[in-house]
Amino acid sequence: MKIALDAMSGDFAPISTVKGAIEALEEIEGLQVILVGKEGIIKEELKKYKYDTNRIEIKNADEVIVMTDDPVKAVREKKDSSMNVCIDLVKEKLAQASVSCGNTGALLASSQLKLKRIKGVLRPAIAVLFPNKKDSGTLFLDLGANSDSKPEFLNQFATMGSKYMEIFSGKKNPKVALLNIGEEETKGNELTRETYALLKENKDIDFYGNIESTKIMEGDVDVVVTDGYTGNILLKTSEGIGKFIFHIVKESIMESWISKLGALLVKGAMKKVKKKTEASEYGGAIFLGLSELSLKAHGNSDSRAIKNALKVASKFIELNFIEELRKTMEVE
């Protein structure tokens, strides 16, 4: 399998991207990576490592789309950007998937423009697998692809999300919930009430009902559906709360020698907690509904996050994910 990696995008690129690619090669049998970006810089980074040269390619791209760029304008004007070239490689069947840490809006625009949607899909959604108490994983979508949504979009997100969990996680009859401010059918705004009515009638899903944000990590449901505006706020709020909790724990530990001693006793447990809750453990988010694989890794991804994003992309390829999803969506 061959994956195009945007080597120049992200807070720590190209150091993190090149290192992550090398680490992925060590763990994923049969993987080949195309490092896309400024060839000279990539070659300098590669000198740090020993690797199978048959499994790494370099595709030169002289431009980089940065976080401050206007997404649509950047896609149109920076045609030779590392991000655009990655998507081109997938479009031209020279790679089976693309992974980028870059500007989300630009990546979505480039992916939609060049890869198109699966026939029958109204809008793609950003889908991310979150940890939960039962260690089964809960899929959240949409986390930012569509700030303005319609009930029919969310209804389709539910179908795609359910199919995702069937294919990717092996779940039978995944439970799908609608994020809302209360569990009752009458709760919420016009969008959630109309969406609820559609989800009740959707024969392709096992509809759980409404779910409040306080219960989304319990593991009682497999898929949580919301609009992109709400979903993006949910994602960033959860990340912020996680960072804050670890910050105050660290501050508390440093207050006295007794607390420092206590910290040593729970060091192993704290490492497990951090590993379970860090975004880097869960690889990339997929633009669900596109006709090819395009994954978005976090902008501040370190090498481990890059490695895990490549692992997720590899699993999608191995499972023939797009074709399996297409079977469901094209008959709707």
Swiss-Prot record:
EC supergroup of this enzyme: transferase
Catalytic reactions of this protein: a fatty acyl-[ACP] + phosphate = an acyl phosphate + holo-[ACP]
Gene Ontology CC terms, in alphabetical order: cytoplasm
UniProt signal peptide: none
Statement: the UniProt record of this protein carries the keyword Lipid biosynthesis: yes
GO annotation terms (biological process): fatty acid biosynthetic process; phospholipid biosynthetic process
A Pfam family per the record: FA_synthesis
InterPro entries the record matches: FA_synthesis, Phospholipid_synth_PlsX-like
Subcellular location as annotated: Cytoplasm
Listed GO MF terms: phosphate:acyl-[acyl carrier protein] acyltransferase activity
Subunit structure: Homodimer. Probably interacts with PlsY.
Family: Belongs to the PlsX family.
NCBIfam families: plsX
Annotated protein name in UniProt: Phosphate acyltransferase
